[in-house]
Amino acid sequence: MTVQNPQEPEYFPEVFPQDAFPQYAWDEGMRPITLPHEVWLSETTHRDGQQGGLPLSLDTSRRIYDILCEITGDSTAIRHAEFFPYRDSDRNALIYALERHRDGAPIEPTTWIRARREDVELIKRIGVIETGLLSSSSDYHTFHKFGSGGRTQAASMYLDAVTMALDHGIRPRVHLEDTTRSSPDFVRALVEEVLKTAERYPAELQPRFRVCDTLGIGLPYDDVSLPRSIPRWIRLLRGFGLSPSQIELHPHNDTWLVVANCLAAIREGCGVISGTTLGTGERTGNAPLEAVMVHLLGMGYWSGARVNLPAVNKLVELYEGIGAGPSQKYPFFGRDAYVTRAGIHADGLNKFWWMYAPFNAPLLTGRELDVALTKDSGQAGLLFVLNKRLGLQLEKGDPRVAEVLAWMDRQWDAGRVSAVEWSELEPVVEKAFATEEGVG
């Protein structure tokens, strides 16, 4: 037999450390040379999250901003938060964030506005120093918003707004809406004109460009053609000599590739990802920034400071309180993200905790591994729950466990299909254990 048993198990600790998220291990010489030196995130919950149906009162908006600041801490992971400036409640939330930022909060508030002179005037009065400018770039938009003027009229309007922003000392972020259905020729021409316009302004006002996968149809592959290839769009913009921090990706999740597209963009040299924590947003949502963070941490970004991902749980609680919580099976922070229902998996957890743990979830996310007691969880699932709840080391064959399991089996035999909650099981356990073991 050619299979030989090693003296010690191989757990690949350099890839799966017990105190960090899984790491990206590059073979020698294979780390992508286009990876940016630094990557950071732009949070758009106050804009796209709200636009997608998140019900934000002024108080809720303030609390979200504060939680986002708690998540990023001094890591610089999240540097921008994007706001609407139009309604009173949105302006008041924006002003609150601006005041907090001036007092030292780590996230700089920016805005999303239409490429109109009056909108630029509005944010100048508020005191914003960077803004996104809606610059629809596909013919699906230009030919139907500007009629016969099409691309020419659209470009003229965008450039006028860019110039006005620069004149007011506001850094423009050109949002190339619907990039993944846009003509590369038009995008090249528009970017070239924007950069030419900005030449006479100082470095801190040089524009950023947001690649918008507005309908989530972008692909993370560089061997497919434009306009759908996200890496090729990033490469096109890098070709203008733009730094990674001048290029931003804003993807949607309509075809399930939102995180893959973020990672593909970063690999190609994009330095900023726009999304929302917990993935809220228009239609199927934006890039879930906590997921992007996990991958970037695995690549070694922000290694000098702690990203406080367990603080995302505060956002989960807040959203649940306004009826907009994540689904139970939402990765990382859903109620059931680390809950198994299969007895064979529960048996693995009992034997070796790491067998069915992708990483140290309690440490890194503040979420416990658990087992739901169902008809499929069996004795192994019950053992896991009892040992966790009672602080014991019970084993299979314990008659007290058998008594509780028999009660559960009667539930399934009677046609029950829902999980058994601890509140139901506790009196059964107390009776079986006669309370002297300290059931609690």
From Swiss-Prot:
Domain Pyruvate carboxyltransferase residues, every copy: 39-313
Pathway, per record: Secondary metabolite biosynthesis; bialaphos biosynthesis
Regulation: Strongly inhibited by p-chloromercuribenzoate (pCMB), iodoacetamide (IA) and EDTA.
Cofactor binding summary note: Can also use magnesium, calcium and iron ions with lower efficiency.
Single GO biological process annotation from the record: antibiotic biosynthetic process
InterPro entries listed in its UniProt record: Aldolase_TIM (IPR013785), PYR_CT (IPR000891)
Temperature dependence, free-text field: Optimum temperature is 30 degrees Celsius.
Catalytic activity annotation: 3-(hydrohydroxyphosphoryl)pyruvate + acetyl-CoA + H2O = phosphinomethylmalate + CoA + H(+)
Pfam families assigned: HMGL-like
Protein role: Involved in the biosynthesis of phosphinothricin tripeptide (PTT), also known as bialaphos (BA), a natural-product antibiotic and potent herbicide. Catalyzes the condensation berween phosphinopyruvic acid (PPA), an analog of oxalacetic acid, and acetyl-CoA to form R-2-phosphinomethylmalic acid (PMM). Can also act on oxaloacetate, but shows no activity when acetyl-CoA is substituted by propionyl-CoA or butyryl-CoA.
Quaternary data: Homodimer.
Protein's name according to its UniProt entry: 2-phosphinomethylmalate synthase
Protein's organism: Streptomyces hygroscopicus
Gene: Pmms
